[in-house]
Amino acid sequence: MHKGIMRNEHEHKLQVAICKWLDWTQDFYYYAIPNGGARHRLVAIKLKMEGAKAGVADMFWMVSNKRWKGLFVEVKIEKGTQQPNQKAFEQIALAHGYYYAVVRSIEDCESLIKRFKADEL
């Protein structure tokens, strides 16, 4: 199997686990942003026409604190790195008052939301 496909599959499984954890432990609304992944060319064209943008984070957590309006979350496996368009989106999000975080585990999510809700970020 191709390395990129394996990475995407591992990130998929991690994001599914994160969603289950959020459902079990958190009381705020969140949603996935389906911009990435392999898909048929026509589907990709259709999504782009509907406003899909390269580099947008994997998830949005609709929770605010004293400083930030909400939280964009990029899911990466341990060795995963942000692409240039993801780094560009991070800067756009921060400039518009939204926190941006990269998570690699459920533990990262637990720490992130605890610190976020305590206004430590």
Description of each model-found segment:
Residues 1-121:
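Catalytic phosphate/metal-binding cores of nucleic-acid and nucleotide-processing enzymes, i.e., regions
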